[in-house]
Amino acid sequence: MAGDSRNAMNQDMEIGVTPWDPKKIPKQARDYVPIATDRTRLLAEGKKPRQRYMEKSGKCNVHHGNVQETYRYLSDLFTTLVDLKWRFNLLVFTMVYTVTWLFFGFIWWLIAYIRGDLDHVGDQEWIPCVENLSGFVSAFLFSIETETTIGYGFRVITEKCPEGIILLLVQAILGSIVNAFMVGCMFVKISQPKKRAETLMFSNNAVISMRDEKLCLMFRVGDLRNSHIVEASIRAKLIKSRQTKEGEFIPLNQTDINVGFDTGDDRLFLVSPLIISHEINQKSPFWEMSQAQLHQEEFEVVVILEGMVEATGMTCQARSSYMDTEVLWGHRFTPVLTLEKGFYEVDYNTFHDTYETNTPSCCAKELAEMKREGRLLQYLPSPPLLGGCAEAGLDAEAEQNEEDEPKGLGGSREARGSV
């Protein structure tokens, strides 16, 4: 009996029966067809359109839907108002002042109505709470004069109205709070360093090429302003969906890309454009990615540049991203820095330009094995680029190899040359 159940279980696993409800699969994985095997569960990818995780401008394409606990936004009301767009912020700014003026204007009119001041308009012997207050419009104007502290003119409060004096104190205090809150919100929104990021540039493409006999992923950053970014730092992340060995689908998994954190190269002195380099080593997520695999993979590299604005001391952040189609294999960036009389000049017309260079099409793992076996000479610069010393070094190495070979097996140089 136990053997029959075990055989039935094995048959179910072989034919690919899925034990879970497809409706419970995450939304990001619904375009994938689950396949069950005896070792692991794989997801066969279906056709779906590509979508950027982050725009080139730094805007994240993430929408927060079905948020039920909306009260959390009200608990942090100041940040919520600052994050609003300008048109909504100005609308809230106008509505708050208008509502407070109308509210206190109604209370001033209500006091005058209860005291009977509206029935004795023009009576010289009657002492009203507020002189020359004849209706709701005049009460509304008196509320504006009180809250904005522009000074009383035709309408003024009298000393025979204690409830009016208390209301005057309350409106003055609440008006100051509203002014501090709304003006502070507008000031913070105006002084945000988001516009400073507009003058921080990222290259349109990232490149992969050889640098110091190692494959490197590189991109270029620059600052258009003469005022520098203080304590500038750069970091990068690889955004790529993956599946664990247990069959769990992780959409938009984030993996750190080392751009010099261990050596301090991630701390930038951004006076002129800099090329940020990521060495593709064993710890790199691109360790086993070749040129052919680059065109088959789907990933996105997000780069984040942070620093303090020199003029204000506020933290500024600029972001950009590179999809797999924007990573050029076998390219280098065109130099933009030239030496002039007494200064260095940066030509931003060629900031995004690249040129092709001799780069192996294999992955960094295979390249490291070739280097250990001494088969890396074909990817080094050609002899005219290396100069006479390199040519002499290659000739000396060839002569040394001839001397080391047995005469019976090696033959003469002329014989090998003819072959």
Curated annotation (Swiss-Prot):
Localization, UniProt: Membrane
Modification Phosphoserine occurs at: S5
GO terms under biological process: membrane repolarization during atrial cardiac muscle cell action potential; potassium ion import across plasma membrane; potassium ion transmembrane transport; potassium ion transport; regulation of heart rate by cardiac conduction; regulation of monoatomic ion transmembrane transport; ventricular cardiac muscle cell membrane repolarization
Tissue: Islets, exocrine pancreas and heart. Expressed in the adrenal cortex, particularly the zona glomerulosa.
Region (Disordered): 390-419
Complexes and interactors: Associates with KCNJ3/GIRK1 to form a G-protein-activated heteromultimer pore-forming unit. The resulting inward current is much larger. Associates with KCNJ6/GIRK2 to form a G-protein-activated heteromultimer pore-forming unit.
Record PANTHER family: G PROTEIN-ACTIVATED INWARD RECTIFIER POTASSIUM CHANNEL 4, INWARD RECTIFIER POTASSIUM CHANNEL
Protein name in the entry: G protein-activated inward rectifier potassium channel 4
